[in-house]
Every structure is written in structure tokens, then in C-alpha cells.
A protein has these predicted regions:
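Conserved DEDDh/DEDDy metal-dependent 3′-5′ exonuclease domain
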Residues: 2-25, 30-177
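Short, intrinsically disordered, charge-balanced linker/junction segments flanking boundaries
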Residues: 180-182
Length: 182
């Protein structure tokens, strides 16, 4: 897992990510329950087979609107890169809105699978991860923590990088289930 803060580090990573085919993404937002939410982190995984976190990049973009704009321009609007989110509608509020291209949402994928095939009480990422991928001990308590303070706690950073790994595994299982039902 790489935690990147400087514009140069993030810019370098964007150049690398532009060459990829699929990215699994998540965001953490400071002040999410106010009128002025602020994008704090962009988490990116570029290898769905990675369960260790070595291919996860955490981009600390709090108060760096210029690098967020660059990420949107180079990654989010780039239609040749598939971008996978859970609840993409929320993340896209901060990452290009309707300009974003080639976006896949695992929440929407799960909802389209008939209930008799995927009988779940809800389609939260945690539920999908436990039921489809047999993940254990998924702690979501840091989801609503204060993403606007620095430095972030080790627990916040761990939560942030695990979400991408979980997302990629859930996406993979949903693709398998979808192919079986077609």
C-alpha cells in the first residue's frame, strides 16, 4: 500500500494508472454530512488479484483541488479505463459527476441480480463481501470517522486500503454470478 500526499507523487501515479484497463476506486470524504463536503482520499487498486494491498494507492487529496481536477481529467473522463465503484453515484459527486466515463457500480450490479439468486437483506459492500466472498471481521466503524483531520490514524488508513481490496473481490464474484445467469 502506498500513501501518497505530494502533488508530484500523485501526478506520477496518475501517469501510471492511465495505462491500465480497470481500476477499483473508493473515496473518503471529510464533512460528508455538511453543506460543504471535502474530498479527503481517493483509494485506487489496479490489480484485482492483489489481496495483500501492495497494489492499493491512497491519494491524500484534501485541500488539493488541482490534483483532483487532474485525476478527473486523466482517469475519470478517460473512456478506455474501466472504473469500478460501490455506490458510484456518491463517489462521482467528487470525481467528475456526469463527465466520468466507463463507470461500473457494484451496487447497481447486485441490484440487477434476481433475489432468488442473490437473496440478501441489503446490498451494502460489507454484506456483499461477507456473503459472496466470505470475508470476516469487516469493520466499518471508520467509515464515518473524521477524514478531515491530519494525520489520519493507522486504523483509518487500514480501513481505506481494505475497501478497494474488498470491492475488487465483490466485483469479481458479481461478474461470475451475472455470467452464470445470462
Amino acid at each position: 500500500m502506498s500513501y501518497l500526499k505530494s502533488v508530484d507523487e500523485i501526478r506520477s501515479l496518475i501517469a501510471k494508472l492511465k495505462k491500465g484497463n480497470t481500476l477499483w476506486l473508493d473515496t473518503e470524504v471529510a464533512d460528508y454530512d455538511t453543506r460543504n463536503p471535502r474530498l479527503s482520499l481517493i483509494q485506487v487498486l489496479d490489480d484485482c488479484k492483489d489481496l495483500t494491498g501492495e497494489s492499493v494507492y491512497i491519494l491524500d487529496v484534501l485541500e488539493q483541488p488541482e490534483i483532483v481536477a487532474e485525476f478527473i481529467e486523466e482517469i475519470m473522463i478517460n473512456s478506455s479505463i474501466e472504473k469500478v465503484f460501490h455506490n458510484a453515484k456518491y463517489d462521482l459527486r467528487f470525481l467528475g459527476k456526469k463527465k466520468a466515463q466507463n463507470v461500473i457500480c457494484t451496487l447497481e450490479m447486485a441490484k440487477k441480480i434476481p433475489y432468488y439468486i442473490l437473496p440478501l437483506p441489503n446490498y451494502q459492500l460489507k454484506t456483499l463481501a461477507i456473503e459472496l466472498c466470505h470475508f470476516q471481521d469487516i469493520d466499518k466503524q471508520h467509515q464515518s470517522s473524521d477524514w478531515g483531520i491530519r494525520p489520519l490514524s493507522e486504523e483509518q488508513i487500514e480501513y481505506a486500503y481494505l475497501d478497494c481490496i474488498i470491492l475488487a473481490q465483490v466485483h469479481s464474484r458479481l461478474l461470475e454470478i451475472t455470467q452464470q445467469t445470462d
